[in-house]
């Protein structure tokens, strides 16, 4: 018995090596704090807290995020649902109802242009 045909298995092609970035993920202030050194005031200049407005904002952001903690979920849920002008009530359990089946919903051309509320 002889083998006929072509194999359906193909060897994987060699992958091209891509140099990974130096850091993966969000940068945190402690990771780059040693790179940015605060400007030292000269003898003739009065010492100010922060001369760079971007660095001043960074300092404010650090203090604000450290004291508040995570935002409440109820606030984030409100932002997730944009108001469309047609505010429907929640279901009888207080939970949101599932969206209607698109096959059952009539388009304005098919129906008499009634509100779905």
UniProtKB/Swiss-Prot annotation:
Coiled coil: none annotated. Residues 32-45, 87-96 have a biased composition (Acidic residues). Belongs to the GAGE family. It comes from the Eukaryota. It comes from Homo sapiens (Human). This is G antigen 12H. Residues 103-117 have a biased composition (Basic and acidic residues). InterPro entries: GAGE, GAGE_fam. Residues 1-117 are annotated as: Disordered. Pfam families: GAGE. The gene is GAGE12H. This gene belongs to a multigene family expressed in a large variety of tumors whereas in normal tissues, expression is restricted to germ cells. These genes organized in clustered repeats, have a high degree of predicted sequence identity, but differ by scattered single nucleotide substitution. Their sequences contain either the antigenic peptide YYWPRPRRY or YRPRPRRY which is recognized by cytotoxic T-cells.
């Amino acid at each position: 018995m002889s083998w006929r045909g072509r194999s359906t298995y193909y060897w994987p092609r060699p992958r091209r090596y891509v140099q990974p970035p130096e850091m993966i993920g969000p940068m945190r202030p402690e990771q780059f704090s040693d790179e940015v050194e605060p400007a030292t005031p000269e003898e003739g200049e009065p010492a100010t807290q922060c001369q760079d407005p971007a660095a001043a904002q960074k300092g404010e952001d650090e203090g604000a995020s450290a004291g508040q903690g995570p935002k409440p979920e109820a606030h984030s849920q409100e932002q997730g649902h944009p108001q469309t002008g047609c505010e429907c009530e929640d279901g009888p359990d207080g939970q949101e109802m599932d969206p209607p089946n698109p096959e059952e919903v009539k388009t304005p051309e098919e129906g008499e242009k009634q509100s779905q509320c």
